[in-house]
Structure formats: structure tokens, C-alpha cells
Amino acid sequence: MQELEQLPKPVEEQNTITSQTTAKKKDAPDTSGLEAAVGMSRKWDAREAGREVAETAIKGLTRPPDFFLLFSTIHYEKHGGFQEFINGVWDVLPKGTPLIGGTVVGFMNNYGCYTRGASALAVSYSNMDVSIGIGHNTKKNPNKAAENCARNILKNFKDSNYKESFVFQLVSGPTMPHFPGFGSGFILKGKVRSALASKLIEVSTKRLQKGIGREDEVLEKMSKSMEHTHIMSGSSSDDMKLSKNYQFFNREIFNNSVVAIGLKSDRKMNLKYGHGFHRLFDQALKVTKKAFGGKIIKKINNVNAVNEFIKTIHWSEDMLDERLHEKTFFFPLGFEYADKTLSPAAIGAILGGGFSFSFRANSDNLFVLTASGQSIVNAIDACMDRDSILTFGISCCANLVTLGDDIYRVQEQIQKYLKDFLVIFTLGEGVYLPSEKIPKFFNETNIVLSIK
């Protein structure tokens, strides 16, 4: 992906970070003790970036943070390493501060939009209980990983008297497997290869933990363990190459894991979600053969799924190349949950006559979806609360592709009414609301937490 750059000079070339945060503190409204500040760094060196992202966040608070959310792009792996990056953060961050985070495609905050660098959210509030948790081997055993993560969080909430509760989890997203004799890539053509590849992807995912992320299964289990809690789930990723991703937990770095933070407070916590997509055609495409629990679609209307899909949207086979997953961002398939919520699902890989999603389709009726740039912009804006003190959200990395430079227009619009905010770009988005009682997973969707 082409790196997003701000129209002004890069942040590390400006001497504005300290003055920006100081100015905001001076004219900030009375928050009755709740403070939230966003940190930022675009330094290339991992350790220096870690220090700067922590420093710029903490300078926005008048008290030490009660928790710290940390996100970075994948490039620090080759510029000092993620352990050095984390060490740089802890050079500055007060000892014992709960910290979770991981690698993401990019982020949007009050400084701009970026696909290289690091950003963080530091929060301080006295009337709030905080607990963090972790679970491992999410691709091999998502249920066990979710159980362990939820158990870690809940054990610290036994004595909490606050009613408002929220969990944010970051789960290791999909990675591209490598099969000897097949290579690796988004397109595997040929009947023999594709039939074998469908089976190999499931085996690779469950045994080698290279393949489909199974984040939707993690969310489903978490929602059962915490049925009265609002949950927001994002998928960790690299720069959309689907090679690797990492999760941060205090001072350590993991992969194939779920890291989560739970909050209980007397503050109202609102969770909104939405996307700008609608049906292109009312007629559903009927799934007649599938595998891997609905993650691999083999046949639609009793014919090869790929052929039926490209026929429906009037594409030629020439469109089926290594950039297919990006092309289908504009025309994803989708299905409806029991409450009629429409879930966009971008095609992940072509497996001969079939294709894969990055999560399970919960219905055998698929619809071709479409959206305009304006409807996507409106969907992001609609998730934001104008009078929020703390704003943290996730947005699909596909929005970076579909919107292009218009993503700056989104950032500028939000900045008109929010002084500090952080939105990370992820590979998949999930939400659970106790009022709906349905764990939902999506692509190309926005989910935003607002605390007033």
C-alpha cells in the first residue's frame, strides 16, 4: 500500500506535539476527573518511537495513566525490533500501567492519518476499574484462548461496584499460509490444487496457525463469558500483506494471541457501529456447498462459487489476480444476521472454483453489496459522539483503499468537534451489545467507543 503522508511536514519534523497538547489541556472542558490523551510518533527508530509515543500521550494528562493502549505499524520489526519499541515505551510509562495493543494497518487521530508510525491512547480516571487479559493460540483453539482471556479480566472485577462495562480486544488476524508445491498467494487455480488447498488451509490454520484468523470465534466465546458487557473486537495485521502480526501485553510481544482490556466505570460508555454498504441486487446468491464452518464457499446456486460471483457482477476472469481482495473491497459479498444487520465480507482468497472469507458466513444467503465514497464517510462520522470526552474506535483497512485521499476529509471533519481521538485501521471488526445478544463480525465496518 502506498504510504499515507500528511499534507504538512511529517510529525517528527514539526516542533508542535508538546505545544499542541499543552494548548488542548488549557482550553479543555471540565471532565470531572476523566482525562484522555493521544500520543503519536513517526520516528523510524523503534526505541525512539516508543519513547515519543508514550511521552506525547502522557503530556496530555495531569495524572499518571490508569491504562495505555499502544498501536504501531509493522515496519518497526526491521528498524530495531518490537522489543526495543516496547522498551522505549516503558522508558517513559509509569511502572505497573496496564498496557495492551499490537500491530495494525494504520491509524487516524487528531494529528492526521498514517500507515507508518505509532499511536497510543492514555486514560486517567479515578472512578474506573481496569483489568487486562490474554489468551494464546487463537487460530488453533479460539475458544480456549477466549476463555483464558475472559477469566483474566473477570477475576479482577469481582469486587467492582460499577455497572457500566466495556471490553476492547485485539485478536491476531489472518495470515497467508505457504504450501510446498503451491507457494503462497491469494489465487490458487486448478481443480486438483484448489480442492487440496481448501483442506490444507483448514489444517494449516488449526495446526500451524497460518491461515484464517478465527477472530469471530474468539468474539463469540468472549460474549458468552461476558454477556452483560459491551465488546469491541479488532483484528491485528501488518501492511495488508498478511505475512505476520503481533500483539502487545505489558512488556511482552506475542503472535496468534488475543489481548484485551476491560473497563468498569460510573461513566456512560456508548458503542456505535455501522458501514456505508447496501445491497446491489435484492436477489440472494444461495450457498450450496461450503467448508471450514462457512469460511470457505465452494458453490453458489450449485455452480462454482467464483464463476457465479464474477458473472453476477459482470467481471471477467482477468480480474482474478493477487490484488483480488482489494478489488472486492468495492463489491464485497454480505449476509444478514438474525436481526437483519448486514455484514460485509470481502473475499480473502480464490481456491480454484471457490473462495474464502476471513470469518464465518452466518447465513447461506449472500448478497452483492456496494457503497459510495460519501456513504462510507457518513458511516464513520455517524459513529462519533460530538460531546465525547474519550473517543476510541476501529475502522476497516479497506476504507483506506476505497476512500483514498478522502480519508483526510474524514479526519478533518472529526477534528472539528473532537480534540483528541484515535481510530485504528484493522483487518476485521467485531461487536457485541448486551441489548442485541448477537456477537457480530464484519469487514469494511466502523465501531467506536465514546465515554462521556
Over which residues does each language-model region extend?
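Hydrophobic alpha/beta core scaffold segments
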Residues: Q2-K452
